[in-house]
Curated annotation (Swiss-Prot):
One of its GO terms (cellular component) is cytoplasm. The keyword Cell wall biogenesis/degradation applies. It holds the Pfam family EPSP_synthase. The active site is at C123. It catalyses: phosphoenolpyruvate + UDP-N-acetyl-alpha-D-glucosamine = UDP-N-acetyl-3-O-(1-carboxyvinyl)-alpha-D-glucosamine + phosphate. This is UDP-N-acetylglucosamine 1-carboxyvinyltransferase. Its EC number is 2.5.1.7. Phosphoenolpyruvate binds at K22, N23. The modification 2-(S-cysteinyl)pyruvic acid O-phosphothioketal is found at C123. InterPro entries: Enolpyruvate_Tfrase_dom, Enolpyruvate_Tfrase_sf, MurA_subfamily, RNA3'P_cycl/enolpyr_Trfase_a/b, UDP_GlcNAc_COvinyl_MurA. One of its GO terms (biological process) is regulation of cell shape. It is an enzyme of class 2 (transferase). Pathway: Cell wall biogenesis; peptidoglycan biosynthesis.
Length: 434
């Protein structure tokens, strides 16, 4: 099993490319199942979750290949041909490691009238039920049962298409919105999704579907209208830049007292995070071709309290990374997690490095080290989920001595060559076998 060894104390400096967004690429790979024509996706990151999704759709009889970019730090191109798809089923063996595999349910059901998808796995950061997916597809006329760990969906006897419907989810759900959006493109009539997720990745998926011939309005708002069509065609689509990877590098550069250009980063997708960074004393600018960030120095940062909410609020996927920054800043901050339960598992590991954090339920209070003269000290820590692992890397970049991060397979699920990109910015970091 691989681990990362980090010798901290170096300010990150230079420029680094931001890869395509995992959370856009995964639903877009599933969207390719909606058509029998070839689909080409550009700027697809090389991640374990992407590899798992490709394996999943190949298992159905889909032809899919992922060619690499020109260098280790560039994303690649995926070509998919689902014309010969023969098995509309996603088995447990592949689904268990990745929650996003549930996104195959809507496209398979819409195109073939049936689908069998295992209940999903992924990071252990809460239950995150799929009941909203089932509720929405049922409103569109699907008959769905859950048995033996599988969701088994089919159209009623005599029906060849899902039916348009007005669907209001009980909560804002990104994957739920995406699943219902994809299913609605081939439904008979108009579907209205109320309380829809507004994330940039949802917007990017909608733009891909429109390029395939879908009729969609309102994406990026809480109400999306979809007029179903009888068939979709192939397309070429570029995956939007990963705002969470960009936010992670913003925090890493800020925490280490550095300066960098994040090529391809989209500042307009990170307003809530950038506002907090600026309040902390960090200079962040949207420039031609990316985002420029300059830190006043780790000891000069001002700790910031925040509360995670749905987009366009502060993203839960940036909570752990910003907490690592607060650890080395001046002052006391309060972090409230409202999206997922059990998402403070990184706190115990940060404590091993010398952080001062008290967590109780959904709230963590951080006493910054910036005005105490104390420093984080390297230690061996264990990644517990994807974003928690990123927070430990950031802390390790600041700590004195060597920090070893175990179980980095979590990191590989969501970051494309993170250690290589950090080395390009001057970090002393290497991947080794445990």
């Amino acid at each position: 099993m691989d681990q990362l060894q980090i010798r901290g104390g170096r300010a990150l400096s230079g420029d680094v490319p931001i890869s395509g967004a995992k959370n856009a690429a995964l639903p877009e790979l599933c969207a390719a199942l909606l058509t029998a024509e070839p689909v080409t996706l550009l700027n697809v990151p090389r991640l374990q979750d992407v590899a798992t999704m490709l394996q999943l759709i190949r298992n159905m009889g889909v032809a899919a290949e992922h060619s690499q970019g020109d260098d280790r730090a560039s994303s690649g191109t995926v070509r998919i041909d689902a014309g010969a798809l023969s098995t509309p089923e996603a088995p447990y063996e592949l689904v268990k490691t990745m929650r996003a595999s549930v996104l195959a349910l809507g496209p398979l059901l819409a195109r073939f009238g049936e689908a069998t998808v295992s209940l999903p796995g992924g990071c252990a950061i809460g239950s995150r039920p799929v009941d909203q997916h089932i509720k929405g597809l049922s409103a569109m006329g699907a008959e769905i049962v859950v048995e033996h760990g599988y969701m088994i969906a089919r159209l009623p006897e005599g029906r060849s298409r899902l039916q348009g419907a007005r669907i209001t989810t009980d909560m804002v759900t990104v994957t739920g919105t995406e699943n219902l959006l994809m299913a609605a493109t081939l439904a008979d009539g108009e579907t209205v999704l109320e309380n829809a997720a507004q994330e940039p990745e949802v917007v990017d998926l909608a733009e891909m579907l429109i390029a395939m011939g879908a009729q969609i309005e309102g994406h990026g708002t809480s109400r999306i209208r979809v007029q179903g069509v009888e068939r979709l065609h192939g397309c070429t689509h570029r995956v939007v830049a990963d705002r969470i990877e960009a936010g992670t590098f913003l925090c890493a550069v800020a925490a280490t007292g550095g300066e960098a250009l994040l090529r391809h980063g989209r500042a307009d997708h990170l307003d809530a995070v950038i506002d907090k960074l600026r309040d902390a004393g960090v200079t962040v600018e949207a420039v031609d071709g990316g985002i420029r960030v300059r830190s006043p120095g780790a000891g000069q940062l001002q700790a910031q309290s925040f509360r995670t909410t749905e987009y366009p609020g502060f993203p839960t996927d940036m909570q752990a990374q910003f907490m690592a920054l607060n650890v080395v800043a001046q002052g006391t901050s309060r972090v409230t997690e409202t999206i997922f339960e059990n998402r403070f598992m990184h706190v115990d590991e940060l404590l091993r490095l010398g952080a001062r954090i008290q967590a109780d339920g959904k709230v963590a209070v951080i006493e910054g080290l910036g005005d105490t003269g104390a420093l984080l000290s390297g230690a061996t820590v264990m990644a517990t989920d994807l974003r928690a692992s990123a927070s430990l890397v950031i802390a390790g970049l600041v700590a004195t001595g060597q920090t070893t991060v175990d179980r980095i397979y979590h990191l590989d699920r969501g970051y494309d060559c993170m250690e290589g990109k950090l080395r390009a910015l001057g970090a002393d970091i290497e991947r080794v076998k445990a």
